[in-house]
Amino acid sequence: MSRILSAPDLKDAFFAGQFHRIAGTAAQVDGYRPFNEQAMFDLASGSRTALLIAAEDVGLGAMGREEAIGGAVVGAAIVGLGELDLVIQPASRGLGHARAALEEMLVDAPAGLTAWSHGDHPAARALANRYGFDNVRTLLQLCTALPFAGTTAAVDGPEQATSSASQQTSTGPATIEAFRPGIDDAEWVALNALVFADHPEQGSLTAVGLAARAAEPWFNPGDFLIARDRASLRMIGFNWLKIEGGSQSNDDNDSDSDSDDVIGEIYVIGVHPDAAGHGLGRTLMLAGLERLRERGCTSAELYVEAESASAVHLYRSLGFIDRTIDVQYRRHPR
């Protein structure tokens, strides 16, 4: 019922246009993106491949190339590295395109293939059950409104969240300062690997991956909060914030914002195991929320593993509530 179209990369203008059209339409209707950031980075680096799903009955062979792609494409996918991401445009759902495409892609799929269902879509759940995929990971997206009433409250006695991450601030036995590109890179990569040693994606981030993210339009070193031990100056924690389309700094409160809804993301937060259990995570969260408020954000969001009970408890205690759920499936051997 469907057929797979592929191109070497998204430098093919026609192919790229249709891929992004499908992804954008799905995001607009569903309320969440069909491909996560890591998948898009992998695609950009060439380590994974983009595919288009076309309706087989359109007769691609008899049509011109542009006409074929424009009129036949009903879905898109990203494959490679043992992972699969697939989306069908809303107007073409319920017609069997996802099932047909999945069956074709599973023919040569590696053992233990994983697939994400962003938004825990019922149709994806049904396909997972039908083709032998088990739920192996649940990721919660939580959100809260800003300004946040508790962002300047004292934490664990002398520790206090502070405003303006553009300059060094004291938080009891630690200081919080902005990330210094080209200086803090190696130390942060090492700490990130330690903190997320059991995390399949975040813990494997290299200096190259950090540089790729620092090159994104949204990156602002002032939104990358670094906690250091006051005595040793060792990096012991971080809270990296992300404001889409927001790399311009408001540090001096001299920027005007005409946006009615600006979402800031707690992109990744971590605390060195030796510093855990002393309130540093909460302090970094409060400092991050204050920073987002200063930057004009009206709400904050984050992603957290559902099984990370202590982290989920912290975020809920700060007023975060459920927004969406992402589920990762793994195909079990047959």
PLM regions: where:
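A structural microfeature
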Residues: 70, 74-75, 137-140, 237, ...
